[in-house]
């Protein structure tokens, strides 16, 4: 991706994050609402941090939220972020963010002026790097560019007495979305010429570039994930999208004993229909690199097969290994601790062991669930049991329910 961006020049992003979230119906501004254990804005920052060609991320927040934002940056290890005090309106906040790059900026926070600046919303966490680059390149070529999406509903205008005045042709009109990008001089010059009315009541940055810098923006059809978290239901939708994204790959950790290998193979065959699955021997998992090098990207889901009755050694070793990393800071990790049992085994002792292990692991944002699989069966029955266990594992990974942590389920 860096090679594809090499002709772009220096690029930065401005994220206005000073909204109060009135439409959300919450006292907490929506950018700070928790989504899967993490503030929404942290997910948005992560999306931009993936693009190494973006050199600076300017987050504009209300003065009363500066300390909170600093704490979020520190806790989640965000990089390349500069905080700026916001204005009373969205446009005034964006203008404050742009001023950081100005040669006339007297504050110590002044940083190198970019050739291209991207403007995005802190409450739009789902932005693809490929599309970001497409918008930025179009802005460099044309002066301005922005994402659009088809209108979902027809837009109508009402008369002063509440009757239909006219409607817009939906096939011709589009919804303006984020991200938008500009040559820095184009958008900064436009904001310098804005009236107070523009700064207080305006909504469209692309229009400011057209009105004050005489630059027509190139409009690009964006992907469907560009939606904005506006209402409370959107928080649930955002959490579902994130859960789906971190549930794509799975690692099965097993030892070399015959029973573990057999069950591990059956689980692999069933789970590969739903996930990208890799199976590794527990003897290989001596360091986190052995696990994470299996995948291109972070693995958040693990199945650990324990053979010995009442033994949690394999699962405990995996928990200890994951706790040495920062992997669980960003997202909750799931470990399904599978225990191979026979008719004579005592599940009560296993239950207390799972709960104790899971309670400690949960403090590190690692969700441990227990699953019993009876191996004292013929081949056909075992296959059916493993198939039922696969359904349980799939539900646990998809839902990531902390209320079920430490529970021992039976396939």
From Swiss-Prot:
TM region positions: none
Function, in words: Cytidylyltransferase required for protein O-linked mannosylation. Catalyzes the formation of CDP-ribitol nucleotide sugar from D-ribitol 5-phosphate. CDP-ribitol is a substrate of FKTN during the biosynthesis of the phosphorylated O-mannosyl trisaccharide (N-acetylgalactosamine-beta-3-N-acetylglucosamine-beta-4-(phosphate-6-)mannose), a carbohydrate structure present in alpha-dystroglycan (DAG1), which is required for binding laminin G-like domain-containing extracellular proteins with high affinity.
GO molecular function ontology, one term from the record: D-ribitol-5-phosphate cytidylyltransferase activity
Keywords from the named record: Cytoplasm, Nucleotidyltransferase, Transferase
Self-association and partners: Homodimer.
Protein name as catalogued: D-ribitol-5-phosphate cytidylyltransferase
Places the protein is found: Cytoplasm, Cytosol
Gene Ontology terms: cellular component: cytosol
Listed PANTHER family: D-RIBITOL-5-PHOSPHATE CYTIDYLYLTRANSFERASE (PTHR43015:SF1)
Substrates-to-products reaction catalysed: D-ribitol 5-phosphate + CTP + H(+) = CDP-L-ribitol + diphosphate; D-ribose 5-phosphate + CTP + H(+) = CDP-D-ribose + diphosphate; D-ribulose 5-phosphate + CTP + H(+) = CDP-D-ribulose + diphosphate
Protein family according to the UniProt entry: Belongs to the IspD/TarI cytidylyltransferase family. IspD subfamily.
GO biological process: isoprenoid biosynthetic process; protein O-linked mannosylation
Organism: Xenopus tropicalis (Western clawed frog)
Pathway: Protein modification; protein glycosylation
PROSITE patterns, A to Z: ISPD
InterPro entries: IspD/TarI, ISPD_C, ISPD_synthase_CS, Nucleotide-diphossugar_trans
Annotated site (Transition state stabilizer): 23, 30
Residues with site note (Positions substrate for the nucleophilic attack): 170, 228
